[in-house]
């Protein structure tokens, strides 16, 4: 009677699993990054209200869903030029949206069709008329500390 090869291999199967799991690289906890993105906001015509900026690391939520942003910041507008610094960024693609909340209600007001009634801007190089800019159009490849200027307009 011939011995089956599967009977010989079967007892070694648990060793194969253990061997492959030991060979995997150990994941380490990432250290905080010193990469920053400075966003300079220009073009707001009046002082007053609130100026806000949101940083997105994925297309999900860009440009208008602040709750899905990786980082966000807003403050009363008191100077002709505002800037925001986003710190501790992992190198990679990001997109930024900014708005000038003129009436201070905490959001970008839009008309019946969803078109903004208050000044806004993004890191996108295009400003589509019938849709919001896409994440891919506004992607900044941040690998070191970077500065970008975004103009807000109606």
Predicted regions and their residues:
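Bacterial N-terminal signal peptides that target proteins for export
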Residues: 1-11
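Bacterial N-terminal signal peptides
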Residues: 9-19
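A short, amphipathic beta-strand motif
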Residues: 35-43, 53, 150
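Beta-strand signatures of extracellular beta-sandwich domains
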Residues: 52-56, 97
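Short strand-edge motifs at loop-to-beta-strand transitions and within beta-strands
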Residues: 80-84, 136-138, 146-148
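A short tyrosine-centered beta-strand micro-motif
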Residues: 92-98
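Acidic, glycine-anchored loop motifs typical of Ca2+
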Residues: 102-110
């Amino acid at each position: 009677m011939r011995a089956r090869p599967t009977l010989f291999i079967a007892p070694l199967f648990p060793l194969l699993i253990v061997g492959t799991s030991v060979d995997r690289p150990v994941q380490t906890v990432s250290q905080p990054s010193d990469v920053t993105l400075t966003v300079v906001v220009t073009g707001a015509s009046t002082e007053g209200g609130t100026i806000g900026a949101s940083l997105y690391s994925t297309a999900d939520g860009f440009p208008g869903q602040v709750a899905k942003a990786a980082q966000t910041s807003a403050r009363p507008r008191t100077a002709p030029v505002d800037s925001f610094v986003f710190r501790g960024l992992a190198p990679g693609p990001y997109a930024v949206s900014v708005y000038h909340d003129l009436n201070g209600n905490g959001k970008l007001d839009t008309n019946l069709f969803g078109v903004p009634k208050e000044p806004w801007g993004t890191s996108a190089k295009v400003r589509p008329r019938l849709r919001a800019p896409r994440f891919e159009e506004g992607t900044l490849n941040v690998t070191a500390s970077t500065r970008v200027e975004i103009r807000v307009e109606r």
